[in-house]
Amino acid sequence: MPATAETASYRLNHVMIRIKDPKASLDFYENVLGMDVIDKHDGGDFTLYFLAYQHQKVAQRGEREAILELTHNHGTENDPNFSYHNGNQEPRGFGHLCVAVDDIQKACDRFERLGVKFQKKLTDGKMRNIAFILDPDNYWIEIISTSRPQ
């Protein structure tokens, strides 16, 4: 069903994933993927971090699109056996995030230099126009080109 007058102003504001160690996750999303923390909320036994790309210069968090919310439940970082289910093993569920880049080869070369773990490199498999990297919690992040053929 196409958008109607009632839904024309709707937009996807954010997606939330749970993280084990905020230091590792913030380092990854800020320094590997170039996102900025635009807001933070301390909720007692948990902390919420809201990250976005700064090219969308809107002051209010609610007016932005494509925000990533990282939820850290305090104490998980101290448990070496703790991990979150990333949705890509049984039982399957959540699949991946996706980041578009201007030059996918250059981005993947940079990820290699930074020691980022890959789930799928550009040279793997039949789909040679996408890659998948892994964040510190093993969430998959698809990397596509902004000029990717449709």
Regions found by a protein language model. Give the residues of each.
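Active-site ExK catalytic segment of metal-dependent nucleases
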Residues: 71-73, 144
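Intrinsically disordered, low-complexity acidic/polar segments
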Residues: 60, 79, 106-108
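Short, P/G- and charge-enriched loop/turn segments at secondary-structure junctions
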Residues: 3, 57, 82-87
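Active-site/binding-pocket entry motifs
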Residues: 57, 73-78, 149
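Vicinal oxygen chelate
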Residues: 1-8, 14, 38-39, 50-52, ...
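Beta-rich, blade/repeat-based domains predominating
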Residues: 89-94
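A cross-kingdom feature marking solvent-exposed beta-strand/loop segments within repeated
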Residues: 78-83, 125
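Core segments of cupin and vicinal oxygen chelate
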Residues: 7-10, 16-69, 113, 121, ...
